[in-house]
Amino acid sequence: MYLNQVFVSKALALQLKNALMALGCPTENRVLILSPKDQDIIQGGIIIPGQAKDELPNKGVVILQGHLDEEYKWYTDLIETGRILTYGMYAGKEIEFNPDIFRKEGISLDLDKNKFTVLSVNEIIYSEVNNN
């Protein structure tokens, strides 16, 4: 089942990275991603009922990476800023930022439609190139 999702571009991911780096970054083997909140329509326009959505993995765009331990260095290319990650439904922890941070940098981002999540690289199921 493929969701009809729209992800932020790699260029916007890099802008977000620059804006957020002044505030800090994920610790150790973690990554900050930005995901669309509403993931209820599959390709073809079929609406997915609430219970069925619980079984689907989440996807999001990498914004920031923490410092990888030696044993996780091989993840480096898989979690570079702008890549799209697939991760489990219950993986990660949502985190909120003040929208003014982005406005000051001239970044237009609708936080009602997007969410930030920090997850461990162990929770990543799949990594793909972002063609946006």
Regions found by a protein language model. Give the residues of each.
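Compact, glycine-rich, soluble single-domain proteins
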Residues: Y2-N132
